[in-house]
Amino acid sequence: MAFNLRNRNFLKLLDFSTKEIQFLLELSAELKKAKYAGTEQKKLQGKNIALIFEKSSTRTRCAFEVAAFDQGAQVSYIGPSGSQIGHKESMKDTARVLGRMYDGIEYRGFGQSIVEELGTYASVPVWNGLTDEFHPTQILADFLTMKEHGRGKQLHNMTFAYLGDARNNMGNSLMVGAAKMGMDIRLVAPKAFWPEEALVATCQEIAQQTGAKITLTENVEEGVKGCDFLYTDVWVSMGESAEAWDERVALMTPYQINMDVIKQTGNPHVKFMHCLPAFHNDETTVGKEVAEKYGMKGLEVTEEVFESEYSIVFDEAENRMHTIKAVMVATLGS
């Protein structure tokens, strides 16, 4: 399968067809295999890439940098305090400046409208490293990981549940991705934390074409039954106030992924996924504060599940790099 995605932006999965997403996943697997075999060919030789980070990052930044270096490109990191973006210069103007200097631009920051504006005016491929609404590169990594651990199943035959804050960028993006790929997704969350109705309606329309099944439920046992994968994310996202913790912990604790929830799937081969970082113990500054305040060593997932044979979170994290590399090669490569 081959598609010409050259010069395309990668801003959200809604912009891509099922076959185009499948192509990116296949290219990711090929590039991963080549890296392990030492046969990788540099498709981005001589390219210059700007990485704009208005939010801090570990996996996304490292994945873009290593992927670019592997492919022969040079990168410039522009951090939260390292530019005039949004302070003395608009994103529209920034886009037109950077588009003259760079061959591709990654953006990780706030509203989706910002990366959309960047994509409109940059005149070079723009890639969404995360916004408040969507996290499309993470979904490619998730789906590649599911394919690797799916015991021979194709994506359209897989069932997975996302537990927790289903209205955040991960809930939104997993729902869009599942709709595009014909999957059975259950969003298991308090009703106040379901995705916006307009996005759900859009995904339901897509599902009618692809055979996907989208379920929104507050019932954990109902939501996880028969699942191949269980997925969660932090209960409080970057940029939200400290006051949000009290409300979230009270509302989300019933949606924690623990061994009881694993067993409720009825699937001995079920796997646990998380986009990371995760609050699964008290070994971080935030984790320690949470443990002291709420008496919980793990929040969205317990240490027992996170460190168990069910967990594939580090395979998932590695695949950030392979899938991001595929996006850059497909849209910018020679």
Curated annotation (Swiss-Prot):
Main location: cytoplasm
Residues reported to bind L-ornithine: N169, D233, S237, M238
Gene3D superfamilies, sorted: Aspartate/ornithine carbamoyltransferase
Keywords: Amino-acid biosynthesis, Arginine biosynthesis, Cytoplasm, Transferase
Pathway(s) annotated for this protein in UniProt: Amino-acid biosynthesis; L-arginine biosynthesis; L-arginine from L-ornithine and carbamoyl phosphate: step 1/3
Location of the protein in the cell: Cytoplasm
Annotated residues for binding of carbamoyl phosphate: S57, T58, R59, T60, Q84, R108, H135, P136, T137, Q138, C275, L276, R320
Cellular component annotations (GO), alphabetically ordered: cytoplasm
InterPro entries linked to this entry: Asp/Orn_carbamoyltranf_P-bd, Asp/Orn_carbamoylTrfase, Asp/Orn_carbamoylTrfase_sf, Asp_carbamoyltransf_Asp/Orn-bd, Orn/put_carbamltrans, OTCase_ArgI
Keyword Transferase: yes
Role played: Reversibly catalyzes the transfer of the carbamoyl group from carbamoyl phosphate (CP) to the N(epsilon) atom of ornithine (ORN) to produce L-citrulline.
Name of the protein: Ornithine carbamoyltransferase
Organism: Vibrio campbellii (strain ATCC BAA-1116)
